[in-house]
Amino acid sequence: MLAAVYHGPNDLRVEDVPVPRIGEGELLVKVHSASICGTDLRILHGNHRMYPSGTVRIPGHEVVGSIAEAGADQKAHPAGQRVFCAPNTGCGHCLQCITGNNNLCANYDAIGVTSDGGFAEYVRIPAKSVQQGNIIPIGDAVDPAVAALTEPFACVVRGQNALRMQPGEVVLVIGAGPIGIMHAKLAKARGAGQVIVSEMIPDRADQARRLGIGRVVDPAAEDLKQVLWQESNSRGADIIIVAAPAHAAQESALELAAISGRINFFGGLPKDRPTVTIDSNLIHYKELVITATTACSTADCWQASQIIASGLVDL
């Protein structure tokens, strides 16, 4: 089979490699679609801790396909079944795993990160992934290219679940990249009264406007605070999602939030510059809640898959 194989920083080769052999409890999936995200780019550039020097591996952790081969003990996943493969597995017995947060397990594994992934014609699904419920059936009506977005969309779902958004609330999304667009679309589907998107990159701002996802503001050309106050009856944003790895965005969120507002620092900062300066009195006197989420659990992937299948959010 053909596969894109990582050999080192900026060295990704399309090679003819053997089709994986499966063992007891494992599955072989024929890949229909595998999407690329920022994690894959960090891997490619040699900036991922799970790809140390000397690693030779097939990346790709956002994978959709059909069951090509299943062991005799895998009656729940017959040959031909279309599935999304949730990438993250935990140890299965730590506190994080048993409370549904296997993405936070200290001993996690992930397809395409710690084992060969989906940038290939076939991918082997480890027995642990099958046992922990990571193989999610998808309907025939769902485009494989859309289903492959289940994992990043699950990260978005996890982020918004932490914010406990209520219908009618004003939502500000800072950053209109793919993740920011997903956040804006999901917020609308969940009943946000107003969605405002802040984006300085012209192409991304134009795309957000074409998608009609809300009021799009270029903070370099407009006063974001003034626009937000106009759209919120001078209250500020009930929900702020910082979907950009920017220090200024995190710092300004506290000022832009309404009283009792909730903020999610969704985009991580560069590891060599991880600190920000904040006015803690704004947190105290406005009773703000600041949270963050990272990656997604298997449960988040199931919920994201159900939302995609429902058609409520067009990805």
Task: Name each region found by the language model.
Residues A257-A258:
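Helix-to-beta-strand junctions that scaffold the AdoMet/dcAdoMet cofactor pocket
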Residues E169, G261-R262:
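Glycine-centered, small-residue-biased loops immediately flanking beta-strands
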Residues F266-G267:
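Acidic carboxylate diad motif detector
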Residues A79, D140-A221, Q226:
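Mid-domain Rossmann-like dinucleotide-binding core that forms the NAD(H)/NADP(H) cofactor-binding site
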Residues P20-A34, H48-L95, I136-G139:
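Glycine-rich beta-strand-centered segment in the early N-terminal region that forms part
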Residues Q226, K271-L315:
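C-terminal substrate-binding/catalytic core of Rossmann-like NAD(P)-dependent dehydrogenases/reductases
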Residues V5-R21, G38-E69, F84-C85, N102-V113:
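N-terminal glycine-rich cofactor-binding segment
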Residues C91-I174:
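NAD(P)H dinucleotide-binding glycine-rich loop of Rossmann-like/cofactor-binding domains
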